[in-house]
Amino acid sequence: MTYSLNSWIKETEKKTKIKLDSYYISFVYLGIIMRLQMKKTVIFDLDGTLADIDIRRDKSLKPNGKLDWDIFAAPNSIMDWDTPNEPVIKMAQMFAKEGFKIVIFSGRNDRGFVATNHWLTKHNVPFDLLVLRPDKFKANSWPIADGNPATDEMRFMPDEILKKKMLDTFVDIDDVFLVVDDRDKVVKMWRDLGLNTFQVAPGDF
């Protein structure tokens, strides 16, 4: 909603029945404008950032050393083997307490959408929006009917391209205060967009 200064003065005086002096008006109105202009969204990655997935990755390896994606992406694997990255979760909690919108963008397959929600709740991770790689549950993991709908190619799309699409679809880039991620290629993409990005760990993969 957009207010002119005069309309704001009239509405406030009507509600409070107090005649506002010019100094008070200038101070309060400036505060309102500054708050409206503040960037209020923080984007978090999930695997390797909010969640430590080392155990799940190790237990999902085949004898030849390659990852068994069926085991790795299984909901019970997420719930049983992922551990919380407490410092990063604490960061999310602090931002949420200050009124920031917490958005989680992950390249994790949406077969684990329900389990991921349960895991986040179990470990007290605050979030306003969770977006996963769309596959089987697009209505939940990519909740948009038009504009930038989920497509089949997103199933195997590189994370840095997928997350750019997530940004374009779900968040106003001008509202992003900070991004927290771990993968080098994704961090580079965020920074190339001019977004302040905190890299929680080396991620050359």
Task: Please give the residue ranges for each predicted region.
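Hydrophobic anchor at the start of a short beta-strand
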Residues: 102, 127, 177, 197-198
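Alpha-helical substrate-recognition element adjacent to the catalytic core
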Residues: 36-138
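Substrate-recognition "cap/lid" segment bordering the active-site pocket of phosphatases
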Residues: 110-177, 186
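Amphipathic coiled-coil/heptad-repeat helices and related helical stalk/stem segments
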Residues: 84-88, 160-163, 183
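Non-catalytic pre-domain segments flanking phosphatase-related domains
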Residues: 3-8, 12-46, 54-57
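Acidic, Mg2+-coordinating phosphoryl-transfer loop and its flanking beta/alpha structural elements
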Residues: 167, 178-205
